[in-house]
Amino acid sequence: MAANATSGRPPSIALRQPEATGWRRGIPAKVATKGTQAEREGDVRSGGRARGRCVRLAKRCSPSSLGLRRRRRRTGGRQGDPQIFLGSDFRLLTPANSNPVLENPARTGSRIVIGISRERNLPFCGRSNLPDVSSL
């Protein structure tokens, strides 16, 4: 019930309860509790509010680490295909001799998406205006 209680409140209050801010709503519980033990005690076991002996742990670890995790989750959702994860495929698909720093990142991204869909015949998510590669 605490997850839905923050909908009408200002964001400053909602941010103090990390699992109620909405970024975790569609994620299974196992993923939502991922993190260090101190993190979990601070934001999950005590329901987002640090009480009891969790106060010190939550204060020390929640602002930076939770903020990082929230940002990473959001960028992951913006990719075209949900089966393409940010960190994993870049190293596998770029040729070994290319320098990824000097390359245009937008070009790299499009080549990766096209390369993956061509290799595995994955359907696009519908946002892409490229032709369907699997039918070629």
Curated annotation (Swiss-Prot):
Instruction: Mark out the compositionally biased spans (Basic and acidic residues).
Output: 37-46
| Region span, Disordered | 1-51
Q: What is the lineage of its organism?
A: Eukaryota, Metazoa, Chordata, Craniata, Vertebrata
Question: What is the source species?
Answer: Homo sapiens
| Name under which the protein is recorded | Putative uncharacterized protein ERCC6L2-AS1
